[in-house]
Swiss-Prot record:
Organism of provenance: Mus musculus (Mouse)
Protein name: Cytochrome c oxidase subunit 3
Transmembrane segment boundaries: 16-33, 39-62, 78-99, 130-150, 157-178, 199-224, 233-255
Single GO MF descriptor: cytochrome-c oxidase activity
Signal peptide stretch: none
Gene3D superfamilies, alphabetized: 1.10.287.70, Cytochrome c oxidase, subunit III, four-helix bundle
Length: 261
């Protein structure tokens, strides 16, 4: 490798963007095949190639940042800006769902019976499973903060315990959300209420699954002594993402579950 006189990371040629694009093609084509022809062959192949690409790409990034020293302070600064912009883009994603919900609920049309929830819809009780889900996510926000402080203070065992608790709470939230979906009396095809409810809460649920995966990777890296109090952007990004998921859920709970019911 040629000598460089700057602190920026010049990425080496990698096949993973190509395999990632190919897996995205397989995933979208597989979804079409599944929806229209009830065949999951392409979808399964797309999921496998996507998982393989993610694993190998992340492995390369971890090796470059942890063992080869490519993630200098100026590179970490750029990564932080990138993560902030990514979270901002996600905020606007959810803003679209909230806009659709409030646009439909504040001035319900005659087609909906002139009321909200629409005639024939039995909304979920916000004081049952949704309130438990809120408590679970708020507790996970506390535990991820505990993990961060433990890392900064060099308390490895506390960090491991707090991170494991956060992951377990995230998985528990996902199970509760799935059980709630099975108990609803309406579906995503039941007009604007069903579509906005399942789209907003389902998209948030997907983010919880992604965040839980992110934290599991961080726990495995922590067990391999990858993080120090000075060099831990991977965990920091996961913590930011998890707090974002917490805040979005609070807005979902107040808007869709409590006020919308």
């Amino acid at each position: 490798m040629t000598h460089q006189t700057h602190a920026y990371h010049m990425v080496n040629p990698s096949p993973w963007p190509l395999t990632g694009a190919f897996s995205a093609l397989l995933l979208t084509s597989g979804l079409v095949m599944w929806f229209h022809y009830n065949s999951i062959t392409l979808l399964t192949l797309g999921l496998l190639t996507n998982i393989l690409t993610m694993y190998q790409w992340w492995r390369d990034v971890i090796r470059e940042g942890t063992y080869q020293g490519h993630h200098t302070p100026i590179v970490q600064k750029g990564l932080r800006y990138g993560m902030i912009l990514f979270i901002v883009s996600e905020v606007f994603f959810f803003a679209g769902f909230f806009w659709a919900f409030y646009h439909s609920s504040l001035v319900p049309t005659h087609d909906l019976g002139g009321c909200w929830p629409p005639t024939g819809i039995s909304p979920l009780n916000p004081l049952e499973v949704p309130l438990l889900n809120t408590s679970v996510l708020l507790a996970s926000g506390v535990s991820i903060t505990w993990a961060h402080h433990s890392l900064m203070e060099g308390k490895r065992n506390h960090m491991n315990q707090a991170l494991l608790i956060t992951i377990m709470l995230g998985l528990y939230f996902t199970i509760l959300q799935a059980s709630e979906y099975f108990e609803t009396s309406f579906s995503i095809s039941d007009g604007i209420y069903g579509s906005t409810f399942f789209m907003a809460t389902g998209f948030h649920g997907l983010h919880v699954i992604i965040g839980s995966t992110f934290l599991i990777v961080c726990l495995l890296r922590q067990l391999k002594f990858h993080f120090t109090s000075k060099h831990h952007f991977g965990f920091e990004a996961a913590a930011w993402y998890w707090h974002f998921v917490d805040v979005v859920w609070l807005f979902l709970y107040v808007s869709i579950y409590w006020w919308g019911s």
